[in-house]
UniProtKB/Swiss-Prot annotation:
Assembly information from the UniProt record: Tetramer of two alpha and two beta subunits.
Entry EC no(s): 6.1.1.20
Similarity section: Belongs to the class-II aminoacyl-tRNA synthetase family. Phe-tRNA synthetase alpha subunit type 1 subfamily.
Keyword Ligase applies: yes
Positions with a binding annotation for Mg(2+): 255
Organism lineage string: Bacteria, Bacillati, Bacillota, Clostridia, Moorellales
Gene Ontology molecular-function annotations: ATP binding; catalytic activity, acting on a protein; magnesium ion binding; phenylalanine-tRNA ligase activity; transferase activity; tRNA binding
Gene that this sequence comes from: pheS
The reaction(s) this protein catalyses: tRNA(Phe) + L-phenylalanine + ATP = L-phenylalanyl-tRNA(Phe) + AMP + diphosphate + H(+)
Organism: Moorella thermoacetica (strain ATCC 39073 / JCM 9320)
UniProt cross-references to InterPro entries, sorted A to Z: aa-tRNA-synth_II, aa-tRNA-synth_II/BPL/LPL, Phe-tRNA-synth_IIc_asu, Phe-tRNA_ligase_II_N, Phe_tRNA_ligase_alpha1_bac, Phenylalanyl-tRNA_Synthase, tRNA-bd_arm
Cell location: Cytoplasm
Name of the protein in its database record: Phenylalanine--tRNA ligase alpha subunit
Gene3D superfamilies according to UniProt: Bira Bifunctional Protein, Domain 2 (3.30.930.10)
Amino acid sequence: MLEVIAKIREEALARVAAATSSEELEALRVRYLGKKGELTRVLRGMGKLPPEERPRVGQMANKVREELEGALKEHRENLSRREQAERLRAEALDVTLPGRPVTRGNRHPLYQILNEIKAVFIGLGFDVAEGPEVESDYYNFEALNLPKEHPARDMQDSFYITEDVLLRTHTSPVQVRVMEARHPQLPIRIIAPGKVYRRDDDATHSPLFHQVEGLLVDRRVTFGDLKGTLMAFLKQMFGEQVRVRFRPSYFPFTEPSAEVDMSCVMCGGSGCRVCSHTGWLEILGCGMVHPKVLSMSGYDPEEVSGFAFGLGVERVAMLKYGIDDLRLFYENDLRFLRQF
């Protein structure tokens, strides 16, 4: 029996030393030390031995078991270190290589245009002001010389939340809020960009669109100041070659009022389908702040005057980029958006 144990020891140690993987070591452990392993069978057969041989056989078998367990453990640790080293070599990173570029999106074309508009007016000395999109009927209409039952209210189909609260139909309420907050400070020179809401939805209208309101209030402000400001803006946005004209119009919150046209950016003013062969495109509305609006905001119209204007960001973007359908800006089509 001692010779059998010695043979098992020699064979097992040789196989353990030659093993090349953790799986192979586990198979050897089961073969020699498992419940049905070769060394286990020897120990179970000790009952058949003469009593005087049992101590020596048991002692040797236990010694071989401990030796095999130690060899398995040591070789397993060596294999683990070797496998880890190989894995680290395979996964090694060259930290001197440039990193993978981060894929970033672009600003939406409307906000690109809005940022351009803001940059031009900031360069002209205007501040940027903001106001609530959910507005009271007073600030949206009455404070802008649009009392209840005024026929001009029919020009703006509105989204009412309650009888006296609605989604603002223009950013003009911001001018009243700013004048009230800054009274009697002069000058007031602001633009108010933001979202506005009207019940329109077709190729040239959207129920949600973006508008920029402009306001300047000071002593001795004239219509000439308004013209000079808007001409400077349009030339910076569309190029020095653009021509500008002012047509008389009507807005309840300005008097006198005007529509501003510029020479068609598609044909240069020679006439085309886009400008209906007139050579001109409407771009914004403007005028001198109505005396009632000034007085309702706390200013004396005999002492101060001002001008205001409003333009649609989508309108500017459509003209600048030659787009004929407003809805393209809101359809989230990446083929369209990636062009900007």
